[in-house]
Amino acid sequence: MNISRSNSLSLKLTLLLTSTLTVMAGATIAPSLPGMEKHFSELGVANAELLVRLVLTFPALFIVIGSPIAGIIIDKFGRKPLLAASVLLYGLAGSSGSYLESLELILVGRALLGFAVAGVMTSATTLITDYFTGQARASFIGLQAAFMGFGGVLFLSLGGRLADLNWHAPFLIYLFAVSS
C-alpha cells in the first residue's frame, strides 16, 4: 500500500462522494411516485400503480443481480475502470426518468441504474480495502457510512422539493454522479 496515495484528498473525496450514490439510488425519487402514478393512470397505462412502485424497487433487484457480475468485471478489467463506467451509467440511467415518457423505458433505466449501483458499491468498497488497512480502514468505512447517511437525507429532501415542481424533476438529481 502506498501511504501517500491512501492519504490523497482527491482519492478520499472520490470514494466518499461515490458512496453517497448507493443510498440515493432508490429513495431519491420516492416523492415523485404519486405524481408518476397520476400521470400514467391518466394516460391509461395498464397496472400503472404496480409499475410505478416497481420504479422504486427495480434498482434493488438489479443491484443483487449485478453485484456478483461487478466482482467478475473487477477481476478482469480493474476497479477504477468499473467505477468510472458505473458512475457514468448511474448518471445516464438514473436521470432517464427526467426525459422519458414511457413507463416501460423508465423501468429499463431503473434496471440499468441497479447495475450501475452494483458497480459503484463493489468497486468503491474494493478500492477502500486496497488503499486502507487496520484502523485507517475501519475509520474510513465509518466515514463512508456517515457520508452515505448524509447523502440519503440530503438527496431525499431535495427529491421532495423537486417533486413539488413535477414528477420528472427528482430524476435530475442522478446527474450529480457525473459531477462527482
Question: PLM features: what roles do these ranges have?
Answer:
Residues V64-E104:
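Conserved MFS/SLC helix-loop-helix module at the cytosolic interface between two early adjacent transmembrane helices
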Residues L11-V45:
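Extracytoplasmic
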Residues A27, P59-P68, G152-V153:
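Residue-level signature of mid-helix packing/kink "hotspots" within the transmembrane helices
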Residues Q135, L143-S180:
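Helix-loop-helix hairpin linking two adjacent transmembrane segments in secondary transporters
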Residues L33-V64:
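Extracellular/periplasmic helix-loop-helix junction of adjacent transmembrane segments
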Residues V23, A27, S98, G114-T122, ...:
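Small-residue-rich segments within alpha-helical transmembrane domains of MFS-like 12-TM solute carriers
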Residues L103, G109-M148:
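Cytoplasmic helix-loop-helix junction between adjacent transmembrane helices
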Residues M36-E37, I73-I74, L158-D164:
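Interfacial helix-cap and linker-helix signal at transmembrane-aqueous boundaries
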